[in-house]
Amino acid sequence: MSKITRRGFFQHAGIVTAGGIALSGALPGLVSTPARAQPAPDRLALTKALEPELPIIDPLHPALTESTAQAAEQPEPLQPIVFENVLGEYGPWAKKMLGDGPAKLSFLRDEFNRGGIDAWRKKARARLLECLAMPDSGGIPKAQVMHQVEFEGLSIQQLQWQLPYGPPTKAMFLKPANAKGKLPAILALHDHSGKKYFGHSKISRASSDVDPLIKQHVDENYGGVWWANQMARRGYAVLAPDAFLFGSRRIRLSQVPQIMSGLLVEGNPDNALDIVAYNRWARQHEHDVAKSLLCAGTTMPGVVVGEDQRALDYLCSREDVDVSRVGCCGLSSGGLRTLFLAGLDDRIAAACCVGMMTTWRDFCLNKSYTHTWMIYPPGLPRDLDYPEILGLRVPLPTLVQNAEHDQLYTLREMQRADRMLADIYKKAGVESQYQSAFYPGTHRFDLKMQTDAFTWLDSKLAKR
């Protein structure tokens, strides 16, 4: 593969990263026909090609600060040397605004202590909710069972419920066939991956008849395993809902102005080219959705978290679920959804965040171009750093899994976020309730990570 420059990268419409979206140009000529549709780009190859062009450079590195005879011969630059970052010359200014922490409402500040943890949590959660500006998403959803089947030893219900807005939400509920009594439960949260045509089907299935694009996605990101099904086989009741803008909750091309959809039309759901074309369009359209939601007085993360809370409401309302033993888990934006939901809702007795841990500094300076608008509550970074959202659940059990070569974050900031969470739990006197691990490799939730995560969830949620 030839080297891709940054200019070429951003001109390549529809570039995908496993964790979210990349900035891309307009797609006015994209149509879902074999003659004009473009194949999905190799997102890992593109990201790796870009990485050497986006180094994290320390402005205090000796190479930039030491005087040398050669440097003395050079004319003084008109502007000070700026470390390369997303914001260019504005980067140092943005970094200074963020500061080195702790943020205003961080539990790590001296004014907060173990004895006042409940008061601190109440204040910090109130600020988070203010920034999220969550819309009214109704009460406990009234789910309809659309189809029920037994598959590979599991009893599976395909569900549907209607929120106060948008198309019906589809979800899959799984548990062991012939299970009796109340079961521990998992809210299984699917990823983003720039593939909005699909939702919960990226992590759960009810038959062997699977779309080839989903199969490829599961092979690449989950070791070939639909992990929601795996959790159900371990004795859990598992609910996997579609998130806002995904699967059943996606925006239909026929319902937006033609100037936005171009020549694209609703295609054949069995045609891979049509699905890829939609996903490319939807990645670009997410920018417009985020702006429109802000104009409506809400935020994309606020909508997503609110809908996940309604799914949790439904899960906890079921007679076959033990509400004292409910956990949640997800990779990438599923990890993001875990972070927000578990940080806000104490019904989550155990939370596993996979491949979605870093800091606001990392997003701001290094990696915002690789991520979705679902991450950013306006105004929050001065009050809470990103990992501290998950830290709001202290002292409840929390597991964070990271990949050492995750292309969506810098290792330095992943490690800094890990230390931040560990320090929060240590200050609260419950150091053992926080666990984390760094795995070799890139962004994924592979079989080794799944085994470790599921074993940990068993230790927190299984009957004693």
Language model features by range: what are they?
Residues 10, 37-155, 163, 199:
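N-terminal targeting or regulatory segments adjacent to alpha/beta-hydrolase or S9 domains
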Residues 283-311, 325, 349-390, 395, ...:
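Mobile cap/lid helix-loop segments that gate and shape the active-site cleft of serine hydrolases
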Residues 2, 10-31:
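N-terminal export signals
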Residues 373, 419-420, 424-464:
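C-terminal catalytic histidine-bearing segment of alpha/beta-hydrolase fold enzymes
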Residues 189-306, 363-365:
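Cap/lid segment of the alpha/beta-hydrolase catalytic domain
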Residues 321-330:
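Alpha/beta-hydrolase fold nucleophile elbow
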Residues 166-168, 177-185:
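Proline/glycine-enriched tight loop/beta-turn segments at coil->beta junctions
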Residues 400-402:
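Short beta-strand/loop motif that positions the catalytic acidic residue
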